[in-house]
Curated annotation (Swiss-Prot):
<dbReference type="Pfam" id="PF00213">
    <property type="entry name" value="OSCP"/>
</dbReference>
<dbReference type="GO" id="GO:0005886">
    <property type="term" value="C:plasma membrane"/>
</dbReference>
<dbReference type="InterPro" id="IPR000711">
    <property type="entry name" value="ATPase_OSCP/dsu"/>
</dbReference>
<keyword id="KW-0472">Membrane</keyword>
<dbReference type="GO" id="GO:0046933">
    <property type="term" value="F:proton-transporting ATP synthase activity, rotational mechanism"/>
</dbReference>
<keyword id="KW-1003">Cell membrane</keyword>
<comment type="function">
    <text>This protein is part of the stalk that links CF(0) to CF(1). It either transmits conformational changes from CF(0) to CF(1) or is implicated in proton conduction.</text>
</comment>
<comment type="similarity">
    <text>Belongs to the ATPase delta chain family.</text>
</comment>
<comment type="function">
    <text>F(1)F(0) ATP synthase produces ATP from ADP in the presence of a proton or sodium gradient. F-type ATPases consist of two structural domains, F(1) containing the extramembraneous catalytic core and F(0) containing the membrane proton channel, linked together by a central stalk and a peripheral stalk. During catalysis, ATP synthesis in the catalytic domain of F(1) is coupled via a rotary mechanism of the central stalk subunits to proton translocation.</text>
</comment>
<dbReference type="InterPro" id="IPR026015">
    <property type="entry name" value="ATP_synth_OSCP/delta_N_sf"/>
</dbReference>
<keyword id="KW-0997">Cell inner membrane</keyword>
<dbReference type="GO" id="GO:0045259">
    <property type="term" value="C:proton-transporting ATP synthase complex"/>
</dbReference>
<keyword id="KW-0406">Ion transport</keyword>
<keyword id="KW-0066">ATP synthesis</keyword>
<keyword id="KW-0139">CF(1)</keyword>
<comment type="subunit">
    <text>F-type ATPases have 2 components, F(1) - the catalytic core - and F(0) - the membrane proton channel. F(1) has five subunits: alpha(3), beta(3), gamma(1), delta(1), epsilon(1). F(0) has three main subunits: a(1), b(2) and c(10-14). The alpha and beta chains form an alternating ring which encloses part of the gamma chain. F(1) is attached to F(0) by a central stalk formed by the gamma and epsilon chains, while a peripheral stalk is formed by the delta and b chains.</text>
</comment>
<keyword id="KW-0813">Transport</keyword>
Length: 181
């Protein structure tokens, strides 16, 4: 089984158990804290992925590192991952969990690149329009990209909406070279 499929299945299992057991908020908070810890500790991720370290040792490491932040139900899940030799996939499982939770809650991640910094009002207006366009709640990640020359580009999953001056100039060049203008 590919690691992505396995990660998604483990994430789905935890999400389902958290919903049924009514500890969804606690599990989500714990996983966010674990994700942050893993992002700040490459050594820990390396240890969890190492085939040289057995499952019992990984279980002990997970318990020592996360017992304060994980809570008992999430710790059971972490022990299961170590037992099933999937502890090394913990970062991917957390990522898949977040994606599944976002799907469940109707949230979509959007990247917005602009040539100039948008004002709070402009950003809020753009996010509202994107929410209307997608029919979902929008979690926007704003980024300044001066190479656009002007305008914005928006990436929604696999779709890119390019309203930049750079893109318009490229299209004009293409039409001029093709003799279509």
């Amino acid at each position: 089984m590919s690691s992505l499929i396995a990660s998604r299945r483990y994430a789905w299992a935890l999400l389902s158990a958290a919903e049924e057991g009514q500890f969804l908020d606690q599990a989500t908070d714990a996983l966010n804290s674990i994700k942050e810890t893993l992002a700040n500790s490459r050594d820990l991720v390396h240890v969890l992925r190492s085939p040289l370290i057995n499952g019992d040792k990984k279980t002990h490491i997970l318990e020592e590192v996360f017992k304060e932040i994980a809570g008992e139900k999430v710790m059971i899940f972490l022990r299961l991952l170590a037992h099933k030799k999937r502890a090394g996939q913990l970062p991917e499982i957390i990522g898949e969990y977040q994606k599944l939770l976002d799907e469940k809650n109707g949230v979509i991640n959007v990247s917005i690149n602009s040539a100039v910094m948008l004002s709070d009002e402009q950003a809020k207006d753009l996010v509202n329009k994107l929410a209307n366009y997608t029919g979902k709640k929008v979690r926007a990640k704003m980024k300044l990209e001066e190479a656009l020359l002007g305008g914005v580009t928006v990436k929604i999953e696999d779709t890119i909406i390019d309203g930049s001056v750079r893109h318009q100039l490229q299209m004009m060049k293409k039409f001029l070279l093709a003799g279509k203008l």
